[in-house]
Structures are given as structure tokens and as C-alpha cells.
Amino acid sequence: MPTINQLVRRARKDVVEKSKAPALKSNPFKRGVCTRVYTTTPKKPNSALRKVARIRLTNQLEVTAYIPGEGHNLQEHSIVLVRGGRVKDLPGVRYHIVRGTLDASGVNGRNQSRSKYGTKRPKPGQAAAGGKKK
């Protein structure tokens, strides 16, 4: 433990918290252009083809972002909105694409958790037709 004299000479340093989404530079979202859209495989016990995109943000940083939901319409040169949020089983993927904004369409046929996937509310008659199958 330091003496009072040592603390007078040099104050204690604050612990600086590291950002989990540094490319966003403290912004909630950033716009970017897809430079590559591809699939990749997750870490060990999981198995799948996860859809990801390499994106050049408006601040000139290049990041890898996950494309959530089933099916997407993204291709090279698509303009997308990127938010923070990692994918636990994809190393290096620390961002998510926001569905339903700019060039990223919402998920078709989505009835639950629609706001997370940019899907509009179905018309009253259509909700029953596209319901759960038993």
C-alpha cells in the first residue's frame, strides 16, 4: 500500500474499460458497405454455415458482421446498418447487421420477435394462415 506522500506525488490511476465494439466509436450504429458476403463455420461443439459479411464502415474501418435470421438479400455493395453484439461461436465477429433498414430486408414469414428482424406486423387474416404447423 502506498504512503500518503507517494499518493500526493502520483495519484492513483483509474481502470479504463475496454470497448466491446471499438469500430463503432461510441455510436449505437454505423452505416457501411458490404465488401464480401460469405458463410463460415462456428467453433467446436457447434456445426452450421453462419452467414456473415465483411463491411467497410463510414469511418473507413473494416469489420465482420453477422447476418441474423433465416435468408437474406445482401450482396457486395449493399448498404447496411451495423450494431454491436458479438456471436459467441464465431471468433472475430463482434457486430450484427440490423435487418429491415437500408438494403437489408426483414425476415420473411417471421411472426415472433419481429422487431429484432425488421419484419412488419402481418395483416389480421394472414396471421392465422402462416401460423405454427403441428
From Swiss-Prot:
The terms under GO molecular function for this entry are: rRNA binding; structural constituent of ribosome; tRNA binding
Q: Where is the composition biased (Low complexity)?
A: 125-134
Q: Where is this region: Disordered?
A: 101-134
Look up the domain of life of the source. Answer: Bacteria
Q: Name one GO biological process term.
A: translation
Supply one GO CC term from the record. small ribosomal subunit
In the record, 3-methylthioaspartic acid modifications are located at D89
The record's listing under Pfam families reads: Ribosom_S12_S23
What role does this protein play? Answer: With S4 and S5 plays an important role in translational accuracy. Interacts with and stabilizes bases of the 16S rRNA that are involved in tRNA selection in the A site and with the mRNA backbone. Located at the interface of the 30S and 50S subunits, it traverses the body of the 30S subunit contacting proteins on the other side and probably holding the rRNA structure together. The combined cluster of proteins S8, S12 and S17 appears to hold together the shoulder and platform of the 30S subunit.
Question: What family does the database annotate?
Answer: Belongs to the universal ribosomal protein uS12 family.
What's the protein called, per UniProt?
Answer: Small ribosomal subunit protein uS12
Q: Which gene encodes it?
A: rpsL
